[in-house]
Design a protein with these regions (language model features):
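N-terminal accessory targeting/assembly segments
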Residues: 1-83
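P-loop NTP-binding catalytic core
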Residues: 67-128
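Conserved P-loop NTPase
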Residues: 94-100, 260-279
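Hydrophobic anchor at the beta1->P-loop junction of P-loop NTPases
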Residues: 133
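Conserved lysine of the Walker
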Residues: 141
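Hydrophobic positions on the alpha1 helix immediately C-terminal to the Walker A/P-loop
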Residues: 144, 148
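P-loop NTPase switch/communication element
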Residues: 152-197
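Conserved P-loop NTPase nucleotide-binding/switch module
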Residues: 203-261, 267
């Protein structure tokens, strides 16, 4: 957590330390409003309002004092710190990027070992098949996917990860900061569809994992990978499988029976439950 705290001005970092950081999933910073720590059970509001200089301080530290080098990420509305932490950025959209930044959402990653273990008997019952992980934003899709990758890799599967935003592996100095298992190869930074084709050509995966599939070209890459006999693991924002079917791109893929199973994540009263659905 020291890597997270170092992003904040000292007075803010000190105030944050008085609260349970191990339970904190997001820190919200909005100019003129109190800092808010978001946990699975609710929000904790600090007495300190975020100043414009605070946001500048956070972004400078997060970018290693090179905002220019992070322009591509900022144009997409986020900044990746290199330790698995992703900072969502909100401000004024211009032709050249994002300016006058007014709020930040600092997502704090957590590795929860064996959270996917109870699901393995159902997911592997007929051999591993392509699986969606489905939930609303912030319910723990990435955490579950990360642990599922690790467990499959430990179990002997060759897993390749297209980690476009660096959240799954948090590769730093060529080494993942999260344990993804001994048989996992990670492609970081490139688009998911480009990474998919490169991994298929070079790493001979049995399993391909993606986080947050949204673009049409990503769907095309998954179709191609499935045609090569590779099992897919992917996450999607939706309340459940039924709501996923209302979106044309997902509905097409589901109708093609490329994905045979889904895991729904439900969050109620701070507790996560998982439900495996056969598609």
């Amino acid at each position: 957590m020291n890597e997270i705290l170092r992003l904040f001005p000292p007075s803010v970092a000190e105030a944050i330390q008085h609260h349970p950081l191990d339970l904190t999933e997001e820190i919200r910073c909005r100019i003129g409003q109190p800092y808010v720590l978001c946990t699975s059970t609710g929000e904790i509001s600090l007495s300190i309002p975020a100043a414009p200089s605070d946001l500048d301080y956070i972004l400078e530290r997060a970018s290693n004092y090179s905002m220019h080098a992070c322009e591509t990420q900022l144009r997409a509305g986020y900044l990746h710190t290199g330790n698995g932490c992703r900072i969502g950025v909100c401000g004024t959209i211009t032709e050249t990027g994002l300016r006058s930044i007014s709020s930040l959402s600092i997502r704090i990653p957590h590795a929860v070992h064996d959270c996917a273990k109870p699901l393995l008997p159902e997911l592997l019952h007929d051999g591993l098949q392509s699986t969606w992980i489905v939930s609303p934003p912030g319910a723990g899709k990435t955490t579950l996917l990360r642990d599922l990758i690790r467990l499959l890799s430990d179990d002997g599967y060759r897993v390749s990860v297209a980690d476009e935003r660096g959240e799954l592996a948090a590769v730093c100095d060529r080494k993942p900061q999260f344990d993804l298992g001994p048989r996992t190869d990670v492609m970081t930074g490139g688009s998911k569809h480009r990474s998919c084709f490169m991994l298929l050509r070079s790493m001979n995966p049995q399993v391909l994992a993606f986080d947050e599939i949204t673009a049409p070209e990503d769907f095309a890459a998954m179709r191609y990978a499935a045609g090569c006999g590779v099992a897919l693991l992917a996450t999607a924002h939706a309340a459940n499988v039924d709501s996923l079917q209302t979106r044309p791109l997902y509905r097409e893929l589901l109708c093609e029976t490329i994905f045979r199973k889904a895991v729904e994540i439900h969050l109620e009263n701070g507790k996560r439950t998982y439900r495996v659905v056969t598609l």
